[in-house]
Amino acid sequence: FTTGDATAEERPLAVLLDCEFWAQSMPVWPALTSLTHRRQLPPAVYVLIDAIDTTHRANELPCNADFWLAVQQELLPQVKAIAPFSDRADRTVVAGQSFGGLSALYAGLHWPERFGCVLSQSGSYWWPHRGGHQEGELLEQLKTGEVSAEGLRIVLEAGVREPMIMQANQALYAQLHPLKESIFWRQVDGGHDALCWRGGLMQGLIDLWQPLFHDRS
């Protein structure tokens, strides 16, 4: 899906996980088109990736290197042949919810040269230790210095009515806080709620791509 008019090779790219949700259950096309016309979002290319089913989703999204290698080496070149986009990391957003939020940050931390902007909503940062009694894998990697968020722009959003996820997101935000100029933290009055996610997705894209408007001015 593409929006607006711009030099094709300069268009930013957004990779949205859970295609079937954003394409069918709660379509984002009208909002993306409207925000682009109002110059709140730049003309862009949007790639929506289908989770297939819950089993595939649970296997492919949580911190799965093979999944993201396939996206970069197989999927994106095919997309680019149809709808050219920029290769710049600072123009590329990867966005997801729950396991998708975890996956989005995983992609940014492990391939920052490709995915420079992360939009995580209700990210499952407890993974793989459900219950909240042990730190999740990504937080452990950040604390040990195995990965770094330096240079990334990150939106973190979680709801007050999802306590385990909120706790994990707060711990992650505390770890990322030294990078506060490039971290957007939002605590919403909701739970694991698609209605909250839709509005947060739009605002997150606006926040992450705002510097592009300054680049063009």
Q: Where does each model-flagged region fall?
A:
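Non-catalytic cap/lid and distal C-terminal segments of serine-dependent acyl enzymes
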Residues: F1-S217
